[in-house]
């Protein structure tokens, strides 16, 4: 145990905040980490001392005991069983452990905690599908690069398939305890990395991890009626676990591409359909495409205006895990003719002249609008 003042070791004042202590420790740890100072015994010793200091000062109870009793608070009993790896913190691990400690809080927990079970990591795969695929469902083929159990050692990590043996440091528990004064600290065993077992003769193909990189081809069943952003879980299809531990899961995230004709709102579909001016005025029947590839007939009543909506029941999207379907809504867009011939213009003028006395009846919306404008001007004049 270092006899130097722990606050001096980290370069902070005695009243420093926990954040200041953490920042100072990270700076010192980066500077003196053995990976950055190979073969430098002084740097290695300094690294151990600042780990020892940080292990005490980062803990509220231990810091209070140190402030009251100094080093004497931790001289009873000394370190317990387990050995190796310093006094918590980054331990004797590689340089990447520092970044695990620094950024672990953003990943749902501290450092290398997830390695204690050896479970493989979960994977994410983003898949684009069409609206038609979302309606009908499909079976898609995906190729996912991931780790898989090593074929040479069958995932055990041992040469010629040799099985791991119980770790003598933690006796198979994956955790070791250290007694420091009044406190007992439990941490991941640095010898077996929390696995509880070690490989005496590692497999050359996988280096003892029991895993190799591999691209696997999977069939993904996409049910009819899925929504944009739907997540599909494939259990056990993620990264392989360490030395035979359970594999992680694969999550397929679906993104439905925008359609050229249809707009979706839940189980319903909307479609803007251009209606010829004559059909809108006289009425008639039109054919419209549907999401299932068929055509449906829609009756257009006389006097249809832009914005009028017509409903086709059960012509919308499939409903997830149900035989039902949503509805399709046709939104009329009355199309004004362009590029008219001389004869067409003559006919339209004749039509306009013929209806001169019927405008209030033929065009109620426009007549009502201009009547309101006239009233407005009269009110302004009177005011």
Swiss-Prot record:
Species assigned in the record: Paramagnetospirillum magneticum (strain ATCC 700264 / AMB-1) (Magnetospirillum magneticum)
Q: Which domain of life is it from?
A: Bacteria
The cross-references to SMART domains, in alphabetical order and at most eight, read: DnaJ
Q: Where are the CXXCXGXG motif repeats?
A: 150-157, 167-174, 189-196, 203-210
Positions of the zinc fingers (CR-type)?
A: 137-215
Entry-linked PROSITE patterns: DNAJ_1, DNAJ_2, ZF_CR
Cofactor(s) named in the record: Zn(2+)
**Which residues hold Zn(2+) 2?**
167, 170, 189, 192
Q: Where does Zn(2+) 1 bind?
A: 150, 153, 203, 206
Which NCBIfam families is this protein grouped with?
DnaJ_bact (TIGR02349), PRK10767.1 (NF008035)
Q: Name one Pfam family in it.
A: DnaJ_C
Q: What is this protein called?
A: Chaperone protein DnaJ
The main place the protein resides is cytoplasm
* Record key words, sorted: Chaperone, Cytoplasm, DNA replication, Metal-binding, Repeat, Stress response, Zinc, Zinc-finger
How many cofactor units bind, and how? Answer: Binds 2 Zn(2+) ions per monomer.
GO annotations under biological process? chaperone cofactor-dependent protein refolding; DNA replication; protein refolding; response to heat
Entry note about domains: The J domain is necessary and sufficient to stimulate DnaK ATPase activity. Zinc center 1 plays an important role in the autonomous, DnaK-independent chaperone activity of DnaJ. Zinc center 2 is essential for interaction with DnaK and for DnaJ activity.
Annotated SUPFAM superfamilies: Chaperone J-domain (SSF46565), DnaJ/Hsp40 cysteine-rich domain (SSF57938), HSP40/DnaJ peptide-binding domain (SSF49493)
Family statement: Belongs to the DnaJ family.
Record domain J: where: 5-70
The job of this chain, per UniProt, is described as:
Participates actively in the response to hyperosmotic and heat shock by preventing the aggregation of stress-denatured proteins and by disaggregating proteins, also in an autonomous, DnaK-independent fashion. Unfolded proteins bind initially to DnaJ; upon interaction with the DnaJ-bound protein, DnaK hydrolyzes its bound ATP, resulting in the formation of a stable complex. GrpE releases ADP from DnaK; ATP binding to DnaK triggers the release of the substrate protein, thus completing the reaction cycle.
> What does the subunit comment say?
Homodimer.
Compartment(s) where it occurs, according to its Swiss-Prot or TrEMBL record: Cytoplasm
Q: Which GO terms describe its cellular component?
A: cytoplasm
User: For this protein, what is any one GO molecular function term?
Assistant: zinc ion binding
* InterPro entries, alphabetized: DnaJ, DnaJ_C, DnaJ_domain, DnaJ_domain_CS, HSP40/DnaJ_pept-bd, HSP_DnaJ_Cys-rich_dom, HSP_DnaJ_Cys-rich_dom_sf, J_dom_sf
């Amino acid at each position: 145990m270092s006899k130097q003042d722990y606050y001096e070791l980290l370069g902070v004042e005695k009243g420093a905040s926990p954040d200041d202590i953490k920042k100072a420790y990270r700076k010192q740890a980066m500077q003196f980490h053995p990976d950055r100072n190979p073969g430098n015994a002084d740097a290695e010793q300094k690294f151990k001392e600042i780990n020892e200091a940080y292990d005490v000062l980062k803990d509220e109870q231990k810091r209070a005991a140190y402030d009251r009793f100094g080093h004497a608070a931790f001289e009873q009993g000394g370190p317990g069983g387990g050995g190796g790896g310093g006094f918590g913190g980054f331990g004797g691990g590689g340089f990447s452990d520092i970044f695990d400690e620094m950024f672990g809080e953003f990943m749902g927990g501290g450092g290398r905690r997830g390695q204690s079970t050896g479970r493989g990591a979960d994977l994410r795969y983003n898949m684009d599908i069409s609206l038609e695929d979302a309606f009908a469902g499909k079976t898609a083929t995906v190729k996912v690069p991931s780790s898989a159990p090593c074929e040479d050692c069958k995932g055990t990590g041992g040469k010629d398939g040799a099985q791991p043996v119980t770790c003598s440091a933690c006796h198979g528990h994956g955790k070791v305890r250290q007694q420091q004064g009044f406190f007992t600290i439990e941490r991941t065993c640095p010898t077996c990395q929390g696995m509880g077992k070690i490989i005496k003769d590692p497999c050359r193909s996988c280096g003892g991890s029991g895993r190799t990189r591999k691209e696997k081809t999977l069939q993904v069943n996409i049910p009819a009626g899925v929504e944009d952003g739907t997540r599909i879980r494939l259990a056990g299809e993620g990264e392989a676990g360490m030395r035979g531990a359970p594999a992680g899961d694969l999550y397929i995230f679906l993104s439905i591409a925008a359609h050229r004709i249809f707009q979706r709102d839940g189980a319903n579909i909307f479609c803007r359909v251009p209606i010829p001016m004559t059909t809108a005025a006289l009425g008639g029947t039109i054919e419209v495409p549907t999401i299932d590839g068929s055509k449906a007939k829609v009756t257009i009543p006389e006097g249809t205006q832009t914005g009028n909506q017509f409903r086709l029941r059960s012509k919308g999207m499939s409903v997830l895990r149900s035989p039902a379907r949503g509805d399709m809504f046709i939104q009329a867009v009355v199309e004004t003719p362009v590029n008219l011939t001389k004869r067409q213009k003559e006919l339209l003028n004749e039509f306009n002249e013929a209806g001169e006395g019927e405008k209030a009846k033929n065009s109620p919306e426009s007549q009502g609008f201009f009547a309101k404008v006239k009233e407005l001007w009269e009110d302004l004049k009177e005011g």
